[in-house]
Regions:
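A short His-aromatic
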Residues: 108-112
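A short glycine-rich, Lys/Arg-flanked "PGG" loop and its adjoining helix->strand segment in the class I
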Residues: 117-129
Length: 129
C-alpha cells in the first residue's frame, strides 16, 4: 500500500480534492471548454476527487467495491454539505449507468484490474462519448 493511503482518511480526502482543483478541472476546461454536467468516478474511495466537481454544480456519482469506503465518502460529503451519490458495487454489475457519463474518472484504479483491455472496452457502454 502506498504511503499516502495510510494517512488519516480526512487528510487523504482533502489532498484528493486539492489535486482535482489544481489539475483535473483546469485540464478538462482547457481541452473541452467546459465542465460536464455529470461525473462518474470508478474506485472513488472516500470521494475526494469528486468533491470539487460537486462544489461546481456537477452531478457526481462514485462507485467503489468497498462498502466501507462508500460510507466514508457519504460522511465526508455530508460534512462538506455537498450532494453526491455513492454506490458500493462492481461498476459493470450496474445496468442503469449505460450511456450516461461525459466524464469518467479512474484514478489509481486500473493497476488493480487484471484484464485491462476488457475493462476499458466496457467503458464504451457507460460513456456518452
Amino acid at each position: 500500500m502506498q504511503k499516502r493511503h495510510t494517512k488519516p482518511l480526512k487528510r487523504y480526502f482533502e489532498e484528493q480534492a486539492q489535486t482535482t482543483r489544481n489539475y483535473y478541472i483546469p485540464y478538462i476546461k482547457e481541452y473541452t471548454g467546459n465542465l460536464p454536467n455529470k461525473v462518474l468516478e470508478v474506485g472513488c474511495g472516500e470521494g475526494g476527487n469528486l468533491l470539487p466537481f460537486a462544489e461546481l454544480g456537477c452531478d457526481v456519482i462514485g462507485i467503489d467495491i468497498a462498502a466501507s469506503r462508500i460510507e466514508q465518502a457519504q460522511n465526508f460529503f455530508i460534512t462538506k454539505r455537498q450532494k453526491g451519490t455513492f454506490i458500493a458495487s462492481d461498476i459493470f454489475l450496474l445496468k442503469d449507468l449505460q450511456k450516461h457519463f461525459p466524464l469518467i474518472l479512474i484514478h489509481d484504479v486500473i493497476e488493480h484490474i487484471d484484464n485491462k483491455e476488457q475493462f476499458l472496452r466496457n467503458f464504451k457502454k457507460i460513456s456518452i462519448a
